[in-house]
Curated annotation (Swiss-Prot):
NCBIfam families: glmM, PRK10887.1. Activated by phosphorylation. GO terms for biological process: carbohydrate metabolic process; peptidoglycan biosynthetic process; UDP-N-acetylglucosamine biosynthetic process. Gene3D superfamilies: Alpha-D-Glucose-1,6-Bisphosphate, subunit A, domain 3 (3.40.120.10), Alpha-D-phosphohexomutase, C-terminal domain (3.30.310.50). Belongs to the phosphohexose mutase family. This is Phosphoglucosamine mutase. It comes from Geotalea uraniireducens (strain Rf4). The active site is at S101 (phosphoserine intermediate). HAMAP family: GlmM_B. InterPro entries: A-D-PHexomutase_a/b/a-I (IPR005844), A-D-PHexomutase_a/b/a-I/II/III (IPR016055), A-D-PHexomutase_a/b/a-II (IPR005845), A-D-PHexomutase_a/b/a-III (IPR005846), A-D-PHexomutase_C (IPR005843), A-D-PHexomutase_C_sf (IPR036900), A-D-PHexomutase_CS (IPR016066), Alpha-D-phosphohexomutase_SF (IPR005841).
Amino acid sequence: MKKLFGTDGVRGVANVYPMTTEMAMQIGRAAAYIFRNGKRRHRIVIGKDTRLSGYMIENALVAGICSMGVDVLQVGPLPTPGIANITSSMRADAGVVISASHNPFQDNGIKFFSRDGFKLPDEMELRIEELIFSGKIDSLRPIATEVGKAYRIDDAVGRFVVFLKSTFPKDLDLSGLKIVLDCANGAAYKVAPAVLEELGAEVIAIGVKPNGTNINAGCGSLYPNIISEAVKEHRADLGIALDGDADRVIFVDEFGHEVDGDHIMAICATDMLKQNKLRENTLVATVMSNMGLDIAVKKAGGRVIKTAVGDRYVVEEMQKGGYNLGGEQSGHMIFLDHNTTGDGVLSALQVLAVMQRHNKRLSELAEVMIPLPQVLVNVRVTEKRDVMTIPEVAGLIGDIEAKVKDEGRILIRYSGTEPLLRVMLEGQDKYQITGWAKEIAELVEKNIGGSEHG
């Protein structure tokens, strides 16, 4: 059982356990020891977003890594996917990202990439933890002549800009497009405007003045209303909003309407199917994706495979099946032909390429998917029992599933952080599925708790 690492590395409030400098140093020491392999010099890349606490955590990690005889390459503020890309392109042994993604500035996190740019498997994280808590690490220190050095890599932003531009079709550019871009005062504040401008777009950039405390503060992908208003005000062709570490992206069309991750996947998957570029004709999404996505992809001759929630599970499924496109409704998109992890700017470029190739507006492209009506009811529970072991609940769910068949679905799952059961239904008739969701919620409430409908 892991104590430190969650689904996306180690997370917490800065300067509070486990996000303290003491623990960051221990994580650095343990990781450096585990990534060492043979007698040669080893190197670990470290990058971060724009949080105030990034400085202290970075210095602690650097000290820990160097103390175990491994060199550090510091790239400064850079999108999470940029750190993955530079780790593999510079042939480092691992990459470290200091970020809490879309969380407020008070939070921070530490996550690792392996030398090939993929997130670490659970067993590697477990080995790092075991070494930290074993108390053995002090006996593994190298002698004074073997400690590591730290180097600053000054051209990391430029390297990543060049890489991103290389993923955009050579026969296209962005001239004639006016784009509102919200960088969330985060890690992409230099990279994203440079990429779009160098490809010929007129860019109205907001959220590009980080001060250490304004990352994700009323800006970025969690606040699409901000770019929606800006698109209408500037009469732009579309809006693009990234989150703090730029691993996810949300769009708004020329009318200011949000275009979420499901629509982006539908646009890209159907376009790749037409070009015979979607491997195995398969898109990988999560159980949270709307069934309208399945319908759109199936109509275009493809299929959708669903995983548990979390981009790491999407990537695992893609690697296992040899697929090249996956993502989440929240805006994490993985184009494995180009990069190894969710990449907001890269995803934006792929959508812009479809727009330019077909000379269509984003609102027209988004019509490829019609979302099914969706209803979500939360039930407060006293215990997280498998609801299918409650006969009357299981019976009702079975009856409803028989009625919706292929034209809807029921998704029932517990919240990972609260004592809530989430009952989600999709179907063609909003009135009907609302009634069914309430029926399920009432039976659950009767058996295992008190209700909070939302």
